[in-house]
Amino acid sequence: MTIPYIVIIAAVISFIMWIVYNKTVLGKNMFAIGGNAQAAVVSGINVGATLIAIYVIAGALYGVGGILEAARTGGATNNYGNMYELDAIAAAVVGGVSITGGVGTVPGIIAGVLIFTVINYGLTFVGMGPYWQLIIKGLIIVIAVAVDVRKYLARK
């Protein structure tokens, strides 16, 4: 049994992003801007340049993801990734990323992706219809956001 190339590429990219987020100035600036952009400006961070770097990195990763998905399926259409954003948001929130910003880790996001992938495959395996799957995913997001807001309010 071999490891799929997509898993290897995802692991390498995750490791690189962990290094960027935890060991570089850009990563610390990203964390600061996510927590409070005004405080980041006051502390001397060039928010504009950092946001441009974030969007460039995100765009490159979206492109890599699209290429890998097209390679996996053998083709692509203009609406192929439709509703993937729901899965991405849900996986991030389940992985511990705060809706209020400034909180989250790369390992937490990976755990959220793995948990949500298991949920997706499990719902498909038991024969649940796609509309019910969307409802369940939405409920998971609502519950995760409610827990996040509760934690946020408890800190205040």
Please name every model-derived segment.
Residues 55-56, 61-63, 72-135:
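Transmembrane alpha-helical segments in multi-pass inner-membrane proteins
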Residues 15-16, 42-49, 121-156:
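Cytosolic-side transmembrane-helix boundaries in multi-pass membrane proteins
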Residues 9, 46-69:
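Transmembrane alpha-helices
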Residues 26-51:
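Short cytoplasmic-facing helical segments at TM-TM junctions of multi-pass membrane proteins
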Residues 23-25, 99-107, 154-156:
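Membrane-helix interface "capping/anchor" motifs
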Residues 1-31:
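Alpha-helical transmembrane segments of multi-pass integral membrane proteins
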Residues 2-10, 51, 55, 109, ...:
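Residue-level signature of transmembrane alpha-helical entry/exit and packing/kink sites
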Residues 14-22, 66-70, 95, 124, ...:
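Structural signal for membrane-spanning alpha-helices in multi-pass inner-membrane proteins
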